[in-house]
Curated annotation (Swiss-Prot):
GO biological process, one term: response to lipopolysaccharide
Induction notes from the record: Up-regulated by TNF-alpha and lipopolysaccharide (LPS) in vitro.
Main location: secreted
Organism: Mus musculus (Mouse)
Position of the signal peptide: 1-24
Locations listed in the record: Secreted
Name of the protein: Protein Wfdc21
Signal keyword on record: yes
Gene from which this protein is expressed: Wfdc21
Length: 63
């Protein structure tokens, strides 16, 4: 019985860690319903990128 309880505990901890990783990966997708101000001008973007307006959002994209 103790071995079964131990295996259950390890399984739950592993599942919890995997769920936390998935939540962290999904967070950027939450910007889809809101305005994302990721840049204010081309100077906020990388060397081969430019700041563009998409709806109410501003994001960096490659040329």
């Amino acid at each position: 019985m103790k071995l079964g309880a131990f295996l259950l505990l390890v399984s739950l901890i592993t599942l919890s860690l995997e769920v936390q990783e998935l939540q962290a990966a999904v967070r950027p997708l939450q910007l889809l319903g809101t305005c994302a101000e990721l840049c204010r001008g081309d100077w906020d973007c990388g060397p081969e990128e430019q700041c563009v307006s998409i709806g109410c959002s501003h994001i960096c994209t490659t040329n």
